Curated annotation (Swiss-Prot):
Protein name, per record: UPF0246 protein Pput_4436
InterPro entries tied to this protein: YaaA
GO CC, alphabetical: cytosol
Family to which the UniProt record says this protein belongs: Belongs to the UPF0246 family.
Pfam families in UniProt: H2O2_YaaD (PF03883)
HAMAP family the UniProt entry points to: UPF0246
Domain of life: Bacteria
PANTHER family (UniProt xref): PEROXIDE STRESS RESISTANCE PROTEIN YAAA, PEROXIDE STRESS RESPONSE PROTEIN YAAA
One BP term from GO: response to hydroperoxide
Source organism (scientific name): Pseudomonas putida (strain ATCC 700007 / DSM 6899 / JCM 31910 / BCRC 17059 / LMG 24140 / F1)
Amino acid sequence: MLTVISPAKTLDYDTPPVTERFTLPQYLDESQALIQQLRELSPAQISELMHLSDKLAGLNAARFGSWTPDFTPVNAKQALLAFKGDVYTGLDAENLSDDDFSYAQDHLRMLSGLYGLLRPLDLMQPYRLEMGTKLANARGKDLYAFWGTRISEWLNQALADQGDDVLLNLASNEYFSAVKRSALKARVINVDFKDQKNGQYKIISFYAKKARGMMSRFVIQQRISTPDQLKQFDAQGYYYSAEQSKPDHLVFLRDHPSE
């Protein structure tokens, strides 16, 4: 089973990585093509395109300018440790064991607007480029057109390498839309996390994002390999709802949200 998650806007390049192991992103030719195009934009154009403040637009213009295809532990950091935010708070990669990192490297992928698809130990230089960005390019009107069926094909290869055909989708709709289902040779398992509020179970974004990270961690640490085993997930009060679930759409409920 292969798990996919979204990246994060928040990055941490200050905290030293907990492992010295690293690999290089596999699709840097694609990333470089995007960088070359992004370098042609002024900070004001970046601000308008990405709906960023002037300060953030300037920061990302500088990032695009200093980006280099030569990745080292000095100018880059392992993706799973560089991303921060709700999903990655739940995943808590800093406290994974070396064996956990090895398992994650084969069974976890991060979708990315700039890098397409990242493995946990792939070095990543800092960037901001959300998958939903309407960056017109030679392949079409946006990043979905740019990546086309490539991400699906890479996921197919990763699944083939482990002799499996189950893809666990713990990514947001924005990012999983970059996976072309028609080109994907996999059974997709979707998951919802619902918290009780005012007597009803609802998807609450903050909690759901963190839960996606917690389930990713659960899969890694417990070496989960089948959809049925996912039903054992019970972190921080969540429990499987057979009543609300379907074979390829699992629902987990929580009665009393906790931070």
